[in-house]
């Protein structure tokens, strides 16, 4: 089997659920229903932000509460990892980051994130992504973390490169957005690479 020559043994993953994480400037915590107004204000209603990670827009409080039902309900499972992103000195949800895929059999998870337009170009996406990477390797025991971006999303490419991911390949015409096909660029980081960077 391809890759078996590496001979890397791995301990079992330990699911711990979504716990609060603090970085230098950010607070990552579970979503709550009272996040609805700042979510609407900062990102979920923004077509440009949502399109960059292939998500629909949510333009009413009722729609956002439906989304929050899904997010908050997910916290009942210990293998569900989704954080609301806040500035430490702020009271508004400025984005989100999650492991939207967890593969227990093969010991990997895949990250997605978004940051509201008004809070971009501040390094927040990189800071939150590095925190999620550390959580995956140190708390959950992942062997590999994956991430991707649309070929037309150059800011996400810069975030991914700053975090130290290794480019794996391009999935051609993976997304269909606004009447055209867009490639998906795929990256990963192995646990030994993560520990080398620490």
Where are these regions (language model features)?
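Acyl-donor (CoA/ACP) binding surface of acyl/acetyltransferases
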Residues: 2-38, 42-50, 86-198
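Short, conserved alpha-helical segments within structured domains
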Residues: 59-60, 81, 152
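Conserved GNAT-fold acetyl-CoA-binding loop/helix
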Residues: 49-70
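Sparse recognition of residues in long alpha-helices and their boundaries
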Residues: 55-56, 80, 176
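A short hydrophobic/aromatic micro-motif that marks alpha-helical segments and, especially, helix-coil
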Residues: 60-62, 75, 194
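A short helix-loop-beta-strand connector motif used in the catalytic cores of GNAT acetyltransferases and
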Residues: 70-84
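Hydrophobic residues in alpha-helical segments
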Residues: 43-44, 53, 75-76
